Amino acid sequence: MKTIQPILTITGSDSTGGSGVQADIRTISELGGYAVSAITSITVQNTLGIQAFFDIPAEIVSGQIEAIMNDIQPSIVKVGMIRRVETLEVVIDALTKYRPDYIIYAPAIWSSNGDALMTEDVVSQIRYRLLPLCSVVVARKKENDIILQDTKLLRMAEGNGMQVFLLDNANSHGLTNRFSSALAVYLNQGKKMEDALAMAQDFINVELTRESNLQGRSSELYNQFISQVNNFCRTYSDVHFYADQL
């Protein structure tokens, strides 16, 4: 039996399952890979957006990564949401120490609803300390413009072998998660970078045709409201009538 080399994902937790470590594990498993994880932050969120964060202490993040890297030794590491400078420092220390074959970075600067996920201090440290270690950056355009706003920096990073892959459909929740996780699986299978990127794009194209089954209470109320309007619009125009129906 062929042994599957695990893929380490270092990122936050999304309680809706649409992004974060949940989306990484689901995508990696769906494509036949095996995911191990280190959690950087826990979000309180639903379909309306993020209500709160709990950032895992840096020493605990470090302990998670060290335990996995020292024992299981994954050759591919995917890095996602990092909100604090001290967390970024322990991630960089571990990546520098263990030097995995591929480091895939999917920046999480804003949520799909536009919530800020990190400060400028973290962004600055990412530019000059994390990017030089990365094999590929998978980003939405607006995040790429922030992370790689310095043309000289981009040339230096690309000179070190880093590639940048930009994704459209910027408002699709968890898009960079799923793409970068798929990319990790294909690289883990021994595919060349160009082939792995193309296969990950094909995977995402199929994913985008699928409608999410996740529906919050606000969507349910909206659908009920539209149904009532269709049924009674010729009879009632008072908004209070429709509010009573809900």
Functional labels for PLM-detected ranges:
Residues 31-36, 186-200:
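Phosphate-handling active-site elements
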Residues 4, 52, 195-246:
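Charged C-terminal helix
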Residues 76-153:
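Conserved beta-alpha-beta core of the PfkB/ribokinase-like small-molecule kinase fold
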Residues 43-51, 111-116:
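A short acidic, helix-capping loop that chelates divalent metal ions and anchors anionic groups
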Residues 52-70:
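Glycine-rich, highly charged phosphate/nucleotide-binding loops
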Residues 1-43, 241-246:
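Glycine-rich phosphate/adenosyl-contacting loop at the front of the ribokinase-like
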Residues 135-173, 195, 201-217:
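Conserved phosphate-donor
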Residues 22, 171-193:
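Short, small-residue alpha-helix embedded
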